[in-house]
């Protein structure tokens, strides 16, 4: 069973834009999303508890508060949410994880923005 546990109940979001930053090729999405979180000084909003995600906890810098490896951060002023993960989502966990994220987005009338990298395509004759 998948669940998203909201820890910042006082934040109000109206049809937010969700920036997805899962680790992928070149970590482009992860790095860009982490930059957005830092730039807007976003608040830790919620954590994911999904079957198949590694059972680990993480902490950031000097803050020793343990958090799940997949988290949502929010900026109420900009109606912005960032989906951040310190672990890749396995192929086995992907369907349930995707359903969990999709349900949350539908419930909050959110607009997703997906970030990912692409490998460099070699031109013919290029070494």
Where are these regions (language model features)?
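Mid-sequence, gly/pro-rich, charge-dense loop/helix-turn segments that line enzyme active sites
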Residues: 61-62, 76, 117-127
């Amino acid at each position: 069973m998948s669940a998203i546990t909201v820890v910042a109940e006082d934040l109000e979001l109206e049809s937010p834009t969700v920036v997805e930053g899962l680790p992928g090729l070149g970590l482009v999405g992860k790095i860009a999303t982490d930059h957005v979180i830092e730039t807007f000084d976003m608040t830790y909003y919620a954590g994911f508890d999904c079957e198949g995600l590694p059972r680990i906890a993480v902490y950031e810098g000097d803050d020793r508060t343990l958090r799940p490896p997949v988290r949502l951060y929010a900026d109420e002023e900009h109606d912005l949410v960032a989906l951040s993960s310190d672990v890749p989502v396995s192929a086995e966990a992907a369907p349930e994880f995707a359903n969990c994220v999709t349900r949350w987005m539908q419930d909050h009338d959110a607009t997703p923005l997906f970030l990912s990298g692409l490998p460099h395509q070699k031109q013919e004759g290029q070494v």
